[in-house]
Amino acid sequence: MVLFFGPPGSGKSVQGELLVERNGWQWLSTGKLFRSSKDPEIHKRLATGELIDDKLTNKVLNEALKDINSKTMVILDGYPRNIDQARWLIEHLPNHGREIDCVIEFVVPEEELMRRLSDRGREEDVREVIERRLAIYHEKTTPVLDYLKSQGIMTQTVNAEGSIEEVHERIQGVAAACIQK
């Protein structure tokens, strides 16, 4: 399993979908799982930029993992967002015949993120919500990278600026190296 880390608008979804299309992998996005959820509490939190609580997030992810063949490479996007989720993931992946092969961190300047998110047109992509989501990402999610590194999980940083194809070439190379380690 490859974990995608990066702030909203860094291109994780686009690159995840390309890896699926070109390699036959499975892309799991907690954001996509949440947006397709019927739970009104999830939609309320999405609209305000708040994180979904760990218990509900873990449940949604656990159910999604049950539906994927353990031999299929999975790209996990948007999870874990905090150290408790990282611990839960490391503890529960073996139940699904999986482990974390590596983490790929997408890096994009904040001005570019604001432009991308404003152009994207999702309901939650208004400036106030974008700023809140970026602040939450830096405050809560970034320390997870340090925790995963402390657990011996390889982490690679990738410049996610440029054309979709340029970024994809970088991501493809790093992802391929991760799973062959």
Where are these regions (language model features)?
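Glycine-rich phosphate-binding loop of ATP-dependent small-molecule kinases
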Residues: 1-181
